[in-house]
């Protein structure tokens, strides 16, 4: 088993270094080694999870193509420019809401330069709002009803009669309070901008310009607004179907019994329908949807789940008895330790959904309560730990003052403190909630 684990970890590390779809395809190579060299039987690939994510990507990409994302950024810019002194508290709420609505953290790219510029103009150290804004976009993944991670968790806990509302009632308040805690801790990070040596050096060397960043205009305001309304309506529909099971239709089977429509199918149908309506109502070119940043970045996550999660699932399935025998008694006594395992795995996989898909079968097999697993859900937000995730790199590049940085020892970077605070508070509150309620 240890040799198999070594191959799995090597595949993950090399895949992460390759970037893009590298993580997913290396997972496929690792799966080939597990199957043909070690003789493990492949488990079923996560088809339902992947199809749900593809449907959400289709809708979000169409909204972006219709100008909906640009319109949301305009709204965010107006809010931040009207309240510049509160930017450290408002910017994480903006990126949290963006991600909560769209289901992907990649929408944060569009608002990060606005945050950086408003902070600079107000003479607030940009590191403070940027650091927690990036973390908020990650935390919201585990609160969004249509994110790949939430969809994967819901799919895998369906056998326990867990509804979407059961997940959201814990994950939304916990992650939101965690983000606010991180924001308050960020209020006094580092020196004031006027005293920062890197900022002063850039001014002295003429590297800092006073050019203002402005978001691009919305070409067709009506089409953009319609796309946002259609997308949000579909999201609300998913929440309603997920929380009120009586709304889901029943179908008669040939043997006389009946079966209720699966939540996976509802998500797929509503999101594909939303995508179609956006294209039809706004007369947006479908080709434009696949050329946007949301489609490209999110499809990489699908490939990652396909390869990495399938490889991880096969490894865990093939070694389940040995794994249970070695760690079951520890996890039974201290189930929160499974949260630490989720955190570490998310650092390696750079994906909340892939982490859930790879690790949750082990948690279920170890007998961990489904509500405990929901409470530990925010622990999969650990990929800020190593500062090479695209949104982290983007935030550093957008900060012209140089205050948002990676430290000399790599791990002492601008996102470590807000990330640990937000994740720690979210998980702690989740554990408290399941004990009280």
Question: Which role fits each region the language model picked out?
Answer:
Residues 117-227, 369-379, 394-437:
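Membrane-core helix-loop-helix motifs of multi-pass transport proteins
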Residues 48-57, 167-182, 257-271, 372-386:
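Alpha-helical transmembrane segments
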Residues 10, 14-16, 26-35, 40-124, ...:
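Membrane-embedded alpha-helical segments and adjacent helix-loop junctions characteristic
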Residues 1-60, 197-313, 417-437:
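Hydrophobic transmembrane alpha-helices of multi-pass small-molecule transporters
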Residues 352-354, 387, 392-397:
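Terminal transmembrane helical module of multi-pass membrane proteins
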Residues 155-156, 249-258, 324-330:
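Membrane-interfacial helical/loop segments at transmembrane boundaries in membrane proteins
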Residues 145-156, 243-252, 311, 315-320:
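Membrane-helix interface motif
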Residues 57-61, 91-107, 132-144, 171-181, ...:
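Helix-loop-helix module between adjacent transmembrane segments
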């Amino acid at each position: 088993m240890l040799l198999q684990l070594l191959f799995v970890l090597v595949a993950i590390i090399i895949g992460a270094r390759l970037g893009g779809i590298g993580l997913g395809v290396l997972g496929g190579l690792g799966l080939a080694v597990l199957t043909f060299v070690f003789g493990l039987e492949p488990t079923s690939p996560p088809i339902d999870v992947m199809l749900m994510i593809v449907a959400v990507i289709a809708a979000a990409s169409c909204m972006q193509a219709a100008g909906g994302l640009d319109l949301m950024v305009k709204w965010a810019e107006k809010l931040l420019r009207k309240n510049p002194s509160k930017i450290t508290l408002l910017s994480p709420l903006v990126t949290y809401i963006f991600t909560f609505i769209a289901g992907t953290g990649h929408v944060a790219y569009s608002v990060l330069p606005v945050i950086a510029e408003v902070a600079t103009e107000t003479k607030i150290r940009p590191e403070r709002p940027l650091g927690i804004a990036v973390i908020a976009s990650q935390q919201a993944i585990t609160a969004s009803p249509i994110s790949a991670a939430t969809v994967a968790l819901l799919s895998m806990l369906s056998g326990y009669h867990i509804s979407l509302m059961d997940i959201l009632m814990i994950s939304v308040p916990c992650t939101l309070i965690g983000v606010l805690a991180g924001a308050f801790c960020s209020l006094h990070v580092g020196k004031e901008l006027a005293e920062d040596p890197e900022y002063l050096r850039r001014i002295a060397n003429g590297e800092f310009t006073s050019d203002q960043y402005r978001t691009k205009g919305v070409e067709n305001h009506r089409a953009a607004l319609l796309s946002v309304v259609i997308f949000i309506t579909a999201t609300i529909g998913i929440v309603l179907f997920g929380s009120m099971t009586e709304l889901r239709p029943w179908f008669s089977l040939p043997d006389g019994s009946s079966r209720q429509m699966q939540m996976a199918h509802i998500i797929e149908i509503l999101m594909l329908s939303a995508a179609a309506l956006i294209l039809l109502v706004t007369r947006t070119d479908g080709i434009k949807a696949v050329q946007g940043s949301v489609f490209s970045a999110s499809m990489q996550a699908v490939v990652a789940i396909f390869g990495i999660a399938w490889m991880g699932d096969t490894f865990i399935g093939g070694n389940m008895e040995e794994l249970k025998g070695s760690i079951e008694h520890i996890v039974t006594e201290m189930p929160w330790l499974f949260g630490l395992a989720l955190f570490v795995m998310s650092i390696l996989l750079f994906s909340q959904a892939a982490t859930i898909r790879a690790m949750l079968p082990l948690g279920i097999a170890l007998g961990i309560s489904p509500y405990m697993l929901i409470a530990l859900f925010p622990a999969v937000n650990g990929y800020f730990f190593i500062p090479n995730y695209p949104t982290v790199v983007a935030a550093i590049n957008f900060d012209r003052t140089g205050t948002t940085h990676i430290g000399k020892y790599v791990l002492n970077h601008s996102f470590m403190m807000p990330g640990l605070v937000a994740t720690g508070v979210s998980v702690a509150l989740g554990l408290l909630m399941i004990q009280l309620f």
